[in-house]
Amino acid sequence: MKTTISVIKADVGSVAGHAVAHEALKKKCDEILAEARDTGILEDYYITNCGDDIDLIMTHRNGEENEEVHQTAWNAFREATEVARGLKLYGAGQDLLSDTFSGNIKGMGPGCAEMEFKERPSDPVIIFCCDKTEPGAFNLPLFRMFADPFNTAGLVIDPTLHNGYEFEVFDVVEHKKVTMACPDEMYDLLALLGSISRYVIKKIHRRDDGEIAASVSTERLNLMAGKYIGKDDPVAIVRAQSGFPAAGEVVEPFAFPHLVGGWMRGSHNGPLMPVAQRDATPVRFDGPPRVIGLGFQIADCKLVGPIDMFDDPSFDRSRQLASEIAEYMRRHGPFEPHRLPSDEMEYTSLPGVLEKLGDRFEDMD
């Protein structure tokens, strides 16, 4: 019997702006998920938050895109929204784009990453949760995990990794997808993945047998809503060890705080800072963007753990570097490259400014 992991997240309210989800919201989610576990919909669950996003980590036997599981997550977020409204929290229910559930949570606002697999004798899984950034934030670290031998030594020396992986890439603008193999199509793959606001990794499979290796939430809130709602704040599930990169190879890419889109009002580039869960409270200019990593063992569809993967002094220098990069980027104020390019400002005030100035623009000599 196969095990399914579903990680579904949403921002349904925060204390003092966009800093952190209130504990009362997580408690309400816990009540809903506990009932689902007791009735057999879920086998196990763990609730955490990265900044103002609540992340529901659930295991079950129902496969991906299961209506009952998605309904459970939706109910949890709806109930938490009511609590948020009672506390007058900021952005109560902001990620929920509909009032009624329609059978699948996709397209309704919350982000969702899922994978189904037959458990190995030992099955380590790492769940990554971000705040103040977009799904493309995972492009670079996932590429390094599964295609860069300078990061993942196993690609060179481990026979079970040596034949590489297949990357399923979504074009979130045109709503198309393509699957590309590494190392054969590495350069073509990088040509896409470098455009992190448009091309995003959805899933990664092992080439030898098609076994699932990683899954990412790819929902783009603003594209769904047609206006600025908030940043997408993606989540990812990554399997480790025994045919996949070692746990240390999985977290290693985050030692480099690469630049991602998001931060203040979802309109600025900044470094992705790897932090312990307790430090996932983005405050400076609503950031800089954060990522947490929780490591579990999957045992008969139960979650063993977690271990806080970035609660490690060896990442202290990465955090220091991220702070230095944040300081440098902030000094640019409203100028690029700190502010996103104009084609990424569609849901801000920029279109209105251009419309207001339309009659004042003249042809140049």
UniProtKB/Swiss-Prot annotation:
GO terms for biological process: gluconeogenesis. Its EC number is 3.1.3.11, 4.1.2.13. It comes from the Archaea. Mg(2+) 1 binds at D11, H18, D52, Q94. InterPro entries: FBPase_V, FBPase_V_sf. Beta-D-fructose 1,6-bisphosphate binds at H18, Y90, G103, N104, K132, Q241, S242, R265, D286, Y347. Pathway: Carbohydrate biosynthesis; gluconeogenesis. Dihydroxyacetone phosphate binds at H18, K132, R265, D286. Its cofactor is Mg(2+). Pfam families: FBPase_3. The active site is at D11 (proton acceptor), Y228 (proton donor/acceptor), K231 (schiff-base intermediate with dhap). GO terms for molecular function: fructose 1,6-bisphosphate 1-phosphatase activity; fructose-bisphosphate aldolase activity; magnesium ion binding. The keyword Magnesium applies. Mg(2+) 2 binds at D52, D53, D131, D233. Mg(2+) 4 binds at D232. Mg(2+) 3 binds at K231, D232, D233. It catalyses: beta-D-fructose 1,6-bisphosphate + H2O = beta-D-fructose 6-phosphate + phosphate; beta-D-fructose 1,6-bisphosphate = D-glyceraldehyde 3-phosphate + dihydroxyacetone phosphate. Keywords: Carbohydrate metabolism, Gluconeogenesis, Hydrolase, Lyase, Magnesium, Metal-binding, Schiff base. Catalyzes two subsequent steps in gluconeogenesis: the aldol condensation of dihydroxyacetone phosphate (DHAP) and glyceraldehyde-3-phosphate (GA3P) to fructose-1,6-bisphosphate (FBP), and the dephosphorylation of FBP to fructose-6-phosphate (F6P). HAMAP family: FBP_aldolase_phosphatase. Homooctamer; dimer of tetramers. Consists of a single catalytic domain, but remodels its active-site architecture via a large structural change to exhibit dual activities. Belongs to the FBP aldolase/phosphatase family. NCBIfam families: FBP_aldo_phos. This is Fructose-1,6-bisphosphate aldolase/phosphatase. It comes from Methanothermobacter marburgensis (strain ATCC BAA-927 / DSM 2133 / JCM 14651 / NBRC 100331 / OCM 82 / Marburg).
